[in-house]
Amino acid sequence: MTDTTFIPDYLKPALERLAAARAAHLEQARRMEDTLTAISRAEEQKAELEEDNGSDTRTWRAAFRAGGAMLTDELKSGHIERVARRELAQECHNLTEVLAFERDQLKATCNSTARAFRQAHHAVLSKYAEEELNRALNDTLGPLVRAMVLKA
């Protein structure tokens, strides 16, 4: 026994619009998910950099004081690394802000594509219900009229 689904011709255009709306919405949802993942990754990296930088600052200052406030090559390179980590943390913060703006735009786009998807789904169901009702009325209208004529 084969399972074949018969799709009436009157539903095919509406189903094509539904498939297109679904694909558009899924693409926007995927982009939003990618953006949310990037935001969380950037926040994690920023937190790691800030944590490393905080402990390195204390270590660097302790070494600087212990060395009699003399800047050695090792202390200079340590300072450069600290500054680089601080700037990287700031870049992660800036990236998070940019991605948050992008996320907000994608939310609006997702809302729009979701609405179009729901409307396309409603159109398919409405068209199917309309055709089925018309067919049912046409199938029963003749016998109903005959019964009314016979009764009168």
Give the positions of each predicted feature.
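Extended alpha-helical coiled-coil "stalk/arm" regions
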Residues: 27-91, 95-124
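Charge-rich, solvent-exposed alpha-helical interaction surfaces
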Residues: 10, 14-17, 38, 63, ...
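A long, low-hydrophobicity, low-complexity, charged/polar interaction segment common
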Residues: 97, 104, 108, 127-152
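Generic low-complexity, intrinsically disordered sequence content enriched
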Residues: 19-22, 53, 75, 148
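Short, charge-rich amphipathic alpha-helices with coiled-coil/heptad character
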Residues: 1-32
